[in-house]
Amino acid sequence: MDDNKKRALAAALGQIERQFGKGAVMRMGDHERQGIPAISTGSLGLDIALGIGGLPKGRIVEIYGPESSGKTTLTLSVIAEAQKNGATCAFVDAEHALDPEYAGKLGVNVDDLLVSQPDTGEQALEITDMLVRSNAVDVIIVDSVAALVPKAEIEGEMGDMHVGLQARLMSQALRKITGNIKNANCLVIFINQIRMKIGVMFGSPETTTGGNALKFYASVRLDIRRTGAVKEGDEVVGSETRVKIVKNKVSPPFRQAEFQILYGKGIYRNGEIIDLGVSQGLVEKSGAWYAYQGNKIGQGKANAAKYLAENPAIGAEIEKQIREKLLKAGAAAEAGKAAAAEADADDMADADAGY
């Protein structure tokens, strides 16, 4: 950059700082890069697939899927994990369907959980915004976007047409709260439902409610599906679940994770630790027997998982090794890609300059 441009830029930056305060504009290289803080989802496989060890703080996340696919269970699991680290959590229950007993079984400290059951969509989003601006809440769940009914629709008659009201409400609210969420370093999760588009001949007819604004403002979008049943004999005790990361602004998207949700217990975390431990060579498997560091921990996956439940220190040790191995490998791969892209850009710049 020539001297005239440098002086002009310095003058502009000085004027911006005087008018808007120090730090309104900054050079990226002047500040050390910091990793994005994350909150665990309660599923080890999903944390690893997300690339940063969980859902990013200071961002909006959307979780959507069919009925009974595990959306609320996954969000309650996020709350339970956040509370273990002393976080303050809130649940905006627009569906008026939160079961405190079930939440307690998943590990949620119900006594410390802030709960709101708003009457209208405007009230729900205003409460969410006020909680965010308090800078005192770490995780907010909104369940669900489909239940955020505009006041005009509630006060109107059955059968009245209210075209686009909910979409406009969501668009306005997200414009307002996105900046506050970043400043408060708060994770806001919107649960959403699926609807079918009529007359779609090609591509998926599925869409989510509430317009397109949430799709743009969300840093992470998770598509959760029930893929099968978990059985003990003839009794169904849980569901096989697959989560696909449809959008991810903090790591590569389109990864997926599979895990089991056990009814009344939540995500089968010890089962994931066994499976990932075997795949990473941390847990030895010989026939039906599982062993860790030469010591047998159980015959069959269920018994091995039961052993980890009875010995949480060993389970935590294996999980820590899995996280370090897979998350560091992912970070190293991303750094390598970034360095390669930078080198390619330098080569192109040199070629353009005639070197």
UniProtKB/Swiss-Prot annotation:
ATP binds at residues 65-72. Pfam families: RecA, RecA_C. It comes from the Bacteria. CDD domains: RecA. Keywords: ATP-binding, Cytoplasm, DNA damage, DNA recombination, DNA repair, DNA-binding, Nucleotide-binding, SOS response. InterPro entries: AAA+_ATPase (IPR003593), DNA_recomb/repair_RecA (IPR013765), DNA_recomb/repair_RecA_CS (IPR020584), P-loop_NTPase (IPR027417), RecA-like_C (IPR049261), RecA-like_N (IPR049428), RecA_ATP-bd (IPR020588), RecA_C_sf (IPR023400). One of its GO terms (biological process) is DNA repair. It is found in: Cytoplasm. GO terms for molecular function: ATP binding; ATP hydrolysis activity; ATP-dependent DNA damage sensor activity; damaged DNA binding; single-stranded DNA binding. The keyword Secreted does not apply. One of its GO terms (cellular component) is cytosol. Can catalyze the hydrolysis of ATP in the presence of single-stranded DNA, the ATP-dependent uptake of single-stranded DNA by duplex DNA, and the ATP-dependent hybridization of homologous single-stranded DNAs. It interacts with LexA causing its activation and leading to its autocatalytic cleavage. Belongs to the RecA family. PANTHER family: MITOCHONDRIAL DNA REPAIR PROTEIN RECA HOMOLOG-RELATED, RECA. NCBIfam families: tigrfam_recA (TIGR02012). This is Protein RecA. It comes from Pseudomonas putida (strain ATCC 47054 / DSM 6125 / CFBP 8728 / NCIMB 11950 / KT2440). The gene is recA.
